């Protein structure tokens, strides 16, 4: 079964995945950025290779959302997946269902603060970033990202619809995190995440793991780790063609 780490882009998804990886996969809570690769993204090309040959047809991708997830869940193990997809229907095809989804962690960020992050990450001017935020028909994915990273179409929609689509899920199995709360009181939010995980996994986190997770996922440390070792999610500026830091301002 899948536990989703869902968010609108540039809302703190990577930060939360860093916390999860620090808690679950690191040595005593001491994160290495490479460990984030243990939480894959959905949808991606490899999820659909034996389901469709038409990777550039958004309806084909939507039609196979559930079959792809059913394939992922064949081994009956719990898996974490990052997604920026809205919890939506496309041409009557639903993104996920209770047969495939165990739980969801959704991260929400003040949309006013997302705009500058979108502009930086996607090499947009501020007006274009605003249009992206408010576009009800926004879809992520293109031939370049497909060839370079295996990305297929992600149905995004606008910020409000995206948030509301995930908000309607079963509250018992959904943890909502605010990006701003992660900044104000990181330890409290880490404890909320840890307690949520205990509902689904046989895990116990010592005080030292919690403290090390707090320290190793602090923004300045993430920035340091990226500078020292690089980060696979960093992007290239489309105007200057230079590699940009993924961890930019952290505000």
Regions found by a protein language model. Give the residues of each.
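Short, glycine/acidic-rich hinge or "gate" loops at secondary-structure transitions
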Residues: 32-36, 204-213
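Non-catalytic, well-ordered alpha-helical segments in soluble enzyme domains
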Residues: 25-29, 189-203
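Short, solvent-exposed coil/turn elements at secondary-structure transition points
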Residues: 86, 110, 180-182, 216-219
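PAPS-dependent sulfotransferase catalytic domain
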Residues: 1-177, 241-251
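An amphipathic alpha-helix signature
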Residues: 17, 112-115, 187-194, 207-211
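Phosphate-binding beta-loop-alpha motif at adenosine-nucleotide cofactor sites
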Residues: 6, 170-196
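PAPS-dependent sulfotransferase catalytic core
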Residues: 210-251
């Amino acid at each position: 079964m899948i536990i989703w780490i869902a968010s609108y882009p540039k809302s703190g998804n990577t930060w939360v995945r860093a916390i999860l990886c620090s808690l679950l996969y690191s040595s005593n809570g001491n994160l290495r950025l490479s460990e984030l690769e243990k939480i894959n993204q959905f949808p991606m090309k490899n999820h659909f290779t034996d389901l469709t040959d038409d990777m550039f047809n958004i309806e084909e991708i939507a039609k196979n959302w559930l079959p792809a997830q059913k394939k992922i869940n064949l081994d009956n193990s719990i898996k974490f997946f990052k997604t920026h997809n809205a919890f939506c229907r496309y041409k009557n095809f639903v993104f996920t269902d209770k047969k495939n989804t165990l739980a969801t962690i959704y991260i929400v960020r003040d949309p006013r603060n997302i705009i500058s992050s979108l502009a930086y990450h996607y090499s947009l001017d501020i007006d274009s970033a605003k249009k992206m935020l408010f576009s009800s028909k926004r879809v992520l994915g293109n031939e370049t990202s497909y060839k370079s990273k295996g990305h297929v179409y992600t149905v995004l929609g606008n910020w409000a619809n995206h948030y509301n689509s995930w908000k309607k899920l079963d509250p018992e199995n959904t943890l909502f995190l605010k990006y701003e709360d992660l900044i104000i009181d990181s330890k409290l939010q880490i404890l909320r995440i840890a307690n949520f995980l205990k509902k689904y996994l046989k895990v116990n986190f010592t005080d030292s793991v919690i403290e090390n997770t707090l320290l190793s996922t602090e923004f300045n440390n993430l920035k340091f780790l990226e500078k020292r070792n690089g980060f696979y999610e960093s992007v290239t500026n489309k105007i200057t063609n230079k590699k940009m830091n993924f961890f930019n301002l952290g505000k």
